[in-house]
Every structure is written in structure tokens, then in C-alpha cells.
Amino acid sequence: MIKPRTPPGIMELLPREQIAFQRMLDVIRRNYERFGFLPVETPVFELSDVLLTKSGGETERQVYFVQSTGALANAAAAADEGAENGGLPELALRFDLTVPLARYVAEHEHDLSFPFRRYQMQRVYRGERAQRGRFREFYQCDIDVIGKDALSIRYDAEVLAVIHAVFAELGIGDFKVQLNNRKLLRGFFESLGVAEGELQLAVLREVDKIDKRGADYVRDTLVGEGFGIPAEQVARILAFVAVRSNGHADALAQLQALEGSVGASATLGEGIAELREVLELVKALGVPESAYCLNFSIARGLDYYTGTVYETTLTDHPQIGSICSGGRYDSLASHYTKSKLPGVGISIGLTRLFWQLREAGLIQGIAESSVQAMVALMDETRLDDALDIARRLRIGGINTEVQMEPKKIGKQFQYAARAGIRFVVLAGDDELARGVVAVKDLVREQQFDVARDELASTLQVELEQARAMLVAGSVQGD
């Protein structure tokens, strides 16, 4: 027999954990839709030449290629005949949702209304080295607003408001959206004489490692042979990226101080103006000032970000790292269309986030089953009645399971308890004679009688009370 096992780098959940994961997906989807984002799905695999247009190097080494058995046989036959294999396989699994979005918008450009607001929540695949907390298959939950030729900076503020709404409803603890602008960093580097484009990008990538590797590591790297930046300039860079704001007024004050202390730079001025407008609009959108701050070290390692950048962290669990990130880019689909399509967006890596929360013991207060009631079967003669009770419960909005085979009532209770089902409905001859059913509440360990016509509404009230207590407990815990 073959040993049943999953490939490395896969998160496979038992039902009660899958319920918790699914509810997080539901919360994210609900908030994306509340802000007017439209759902999009793209194929799990794309044409290789389309998918890999913007990539190379490390990304290409992590791509999973797809080959049919027929294509494999043809390639093998060609190899036997000494022919070249024709390059990469025709298809490849997507490694993120951004490149498929670029292809999607370019392909359907004339059928879409701009600004195009899309959300996408699907699995992506990367050939990561198998290790704890790293996944080869994982969910990403993205939103993007795409403009045609131009896109107002106001959308950058709205995206931050979406981040706040999502994590406030998820209820996984206090969080902070850290905000910066790549133009701010580029303008500051220009004032130091670090103006060459490739060098700037390389420095930005190193600055983005400060929270993970520490300032000493970044200092040693920048003064080392690879960069050779004078120690005095590196010290100024590290002092600049150490800036953090504390509250809305302090954030504006930090920008004001920067505006008056650094040499003139058009790029720096643009970055300051954009950040100031985002901050003012975030306040107007009702995001509490405790939920965001300036962090001048946030750069985002990806080179296509050109303006606003975001990283979100849990205040009490910084070891988890970024739980949501993104930013502004000038042109989404330049490899696929001549149209200029600027945009702003963010991504939540939900699989990694869920795994980290579970490891930290933060996945709590979740029902053990999506089944809310089970109708017990007392004996074979009661099957039609049990099925009718279940039908009425389902019509009343109660997720209901029926025991299809009569067993000892103790075993039926035991099954319901193990399955995480709260209510067991009993309808024997005695209950039928009195026009009621008996309900066993396995959470409160109580049993009560209910009129048949009132069963669904009674259970709805009980479930609503339980949900209210859960919300109250979450608020008190905060």
C-alpha cells in the first residue's frame, strides 16, 4: 500500500480549521465588496511566455510548469531523435495574482470601465524550498484600482481604509498600517548624490531589509564593496529611514520638518505632497489614527512600486511580520499593451497569515462545525418525521444534519459532540404526542422542549445570543 501523504509546502486543514479559514476569507471578501471592488478569477495556469514576460532569475526558478503526458511523450521522442526540446513548456502555474491581472486588463481593456476596481482571492504556486512556515501553494487576497492614463492619489487613501476595515473585522488583535512613499526615498537619495536608477533600486531593496536584518546589517552592506557608499552618507540614510510617526498630527509634522530640512528635490517634494494628501484623506475616511503611521524604512522590495507603499503588522506579534502589503505603480501592463495603466493595490497572503495565527494561538472563538443542528433518529419508524424536521430547520436557516441510521441515543450524542454540533433534536413518540420536539444543547448541557413550529426560530435566537457573546468577548479582549 502507498503511504498517504501531502507534498511539502502544503497547508491542509481539518474541517474545524477549514471553517475558521473560510470565515476569514468571507470577512475579507465582504469588506472588499463593501468598498465597491468587483470579483475576478483567472486560470490557475497561464501561457508561459505571457506569465514570464516580467520575470526572470529567482522568479523563473520557482515557477511550476505544466506539461500534458502527450507533450512529454513528444518531447521525449524528439530528444531521442536529437532534436531540441523547443524551450519551456507551453503552460505554467501562476506565481502571484499581479501578472495575471496585468494580462487580464490588457486583454479586456476595451470591455472594462476605468477606474477598474477588482478583487481576486485564489491560490498561487511557487517552488519554495520546503521549510516550516513557507508554502508552495497558498491563498492571496488582492485588491487593485487600475486607471487609464492617470489615477488619483485619493485611491491610495481608500486602499488604506480597506486594509483597516478588513483587519478590524477579522478581530485578530491590534494592528498598524505603516505608510511611506518611494518618491520620498528616491528624492532623499538624490539629495545625497545617489541618483543613478539601478543604484537607487538596489539601495531601496537593502533599506527594505532593516526590520528583518537590522540596521547594522544594512549599514555594513551599503558601505561594503558591493555599494561603496561613504559611511557618512550611510549614516544619514539610516537616520532618515528610522523616522516613525506617533499619531496623525505627528505624521504631518514629520513631513513638514522634512520639507524644511532637506535640499530642494522635485521628487522629494512630490513624495511629501502625496503622503500629506493620503494622510488627510485617511482621516476623512474615518480610519483611527492609532491604526496607521509613517515609517520611512518601508520600501517594498519589488521594483515596480513607484509611489505610496504599505505594510501592515500586528502590534502585539511583530514576529509574524507583514500581514498585508502593497503600493502604487505607474504602469501595470506595459509588456502587454501600449496603454498606460497606473494603479494601486494590496495583497493579503492568507495561508501564511492563518498558519502564523494558529501557531501563536490566536485562532479562537470559532465554531467547531458549520453544522448547527442534528436530528437524531430514534428508530426506523421515525425516519420520515426526522427528515421533515430537518427540512423545516433548513428552510428556517439552520444548517442541519440527519442521522440516517438508528443507533443508541448515547452514540448519537457522542457523534454530535465529536463533530462539534451544538444542538441535537429528538422526536420520539412522547414528543410527537405533545406536539413538541426535545432539544439537547451540548454547549450548555441543557435539554428543553420546543413547539415544532417554533423550532427553527428558537435555535436562531440561541445562535444569535452566542454570536453576540462572542463579539462582546472579543471587544473586551481588545
From Swiss-Prot:
A GO molecular-function annotation: ATP binding
What keywords would UniProt list here?
Answer: Aminoacyl-tRNA synthetase, ATP-binding, Cytoplasm, Ligase, Nucleotide-binding, Protein biosynthesis
Subcellular location(s): the record lists: Cytoplasm
Specify one Pfam family: tRNA-synt_His
Give the organism the record lists: Xanthomonas axonopodis pv. citri (strain 306)
According to its UniProt record, where is this protein mainly located?
A: cytoplasm
UniProt-listed Gene3D superfamilies: Anticodon-binding domain, Bira Bifunctional Protein, Domain 2
Q: Can you name this protein?
A: Histidine--tRNA ligase
EC class (word) = ligase
Q: Name the chemical reaction catalysed here.
A: tRNA(His) + L-histidine + ATP = L-histidyl-tRNA(His) + AMP + diphosphate + H(+)
Q: Which domain of life is it from?
A: Bacteria
What family does the entry list? Belongs to the class-II aminoacyl-tRNA synthetase family.
> Gene symbol?
hisS
The annotated subunit structure for this chain is: Homodimer.
Gene Ontology annotations for the cellular component aspect, listed alphabetically: cytoplasm
Q: List the disulfide bonds.
A: none
Q: Which NCBIfam families does this chain map to?
A: hisS
The UniProt record lists the EC number as 6.1.1.21
List the InterPro entries: aa-tRNA-synth_II, aa-tRNA-synth_II/BPL/LPL, Anticodon-bd, Anticodon-bd_dom_sf, His-tRNA-ligase, HisRS-like_core, HisRS/HisZ, HisRS_anticodon
GO biological process terms held by the UniProt record: histidyl-tRNA aminoacylation
